[in-house]
Swiss-Prot record:
UniProt xrefs under Gene3D superfamilies: 1.20.5.170
Protein name: Protein Mabiki
GO molecular function: DNA-binding transcription factor activity, RNA polymerase II-specific; RNA polymerase II cis-regulatory region sequence-specific DNA binding
Disruption phenotype: Embryonic lethality with increased frequency of embryonic head defects and reduced embryonic cell death.
Source taxon at top rank: Eukaryota
GO BP terms, alphabetized: apoptotic process; positive regulation of apoptotic process; regulation of transcription by RNA polymerase II
Annotated function: Plays a role in inducing apoptosis and is involved in the repair of head patterning defects in the embryo caused by extra maternal copies of the homeotic gene bicoid.
Encoding gene (name): Mabi
Record's keyword terms, sorted: Apoptosis
Length: 206
């Protein structure tokens, strides 16, 4: 009996590989913590969530190449490396909030259901904290880009003012030549003022 090989696209295998890695990591996390409500320091939680959130993606998908920017001598802003996020903001993300405590009475569950519930709880915490971390990173990138945009706008405005000043200087250099040419023409014109006419009449009578 011949066995026909079924064609499978590599993206399906890759998706299964990621899911298996996620399940293994969650099982290890559950086995180490024991219960999802055990007390941990904010630094340990931050390290675990960040490493679990980005380890699978970094292993399967290589990082994208950085976009090249047109560097100039006047611009002092450069994105060679992403600036680190403030530790106070990270601690605020992983801070324990009282309003997140479950208020309804506990229900008796089988060990399998309780284990599944613990996995779901840990997965929700990881996804929620990872989302907050991503939002914080995007907000910081927005601030850096807005600062760079303001610096570029200020430089362009200064260059425009400098160009207008140069144009005015060029016009002033051409203007004295025209005025010097017009001065003799104005002197050659006869003066028809009242004082001049009165003086001329007095000279004729004298």
């Amino acid at each position: 009996m011949e066995h026909h090989q079924i064609y499978r696209h590599k993206k399906f295998d890759m998706g299964r590989k990621i899911e298996k890695c996620d399940l293994q990591l969650k099982e290890e996390l559950i086995s180490r913590s024991g219960t999802p409500c055990t007390s941990r320091s904010p630094f340990d939680a931050a390290n675990q969530s960040v490493s679990l959130g980005f380890s699978d993606q970094d292993a399967d998908f290589p990082p994208l190449p950085k976009r090249r920017r047109l560097g100039s001598s006047s611009s002092s802003v450069s994105y060679q490396s992403a600036s680190p996020i403030i530790t106070e903001a990270i601690q605020d993300i992983f801070k324990y909030h009282v309003n997140m405590v479950r208020k309804f009475p506990k229900k008796e569950r089988s060990p399998k259901d309780q284990e599944r519930r613990n996995k779901n709880t840990i997965a929700c915490r990881m996804s929620r904290r990872k989302k907050k971390f991503d939002d914080l990173q995007i907000e910081q990138q927005y601030k850096e880009c807005s600062d760079e945009h303001l610096k570029i706008a200020e430089q362009s405005l200064r260059a425009r003012v400098y160009l207008n000043h140069l144009k005015q200087l060029v016009k002033q250099e051409d203007h004295p030549l025209v005025s010097s040419r017009r001065v003799p023409e104005e002197n050659t014109k006869s003066n028809f003022s009242i004082d001049y006419l009165i003086g001329g009449i007095k000279q004729e009578h004298a």
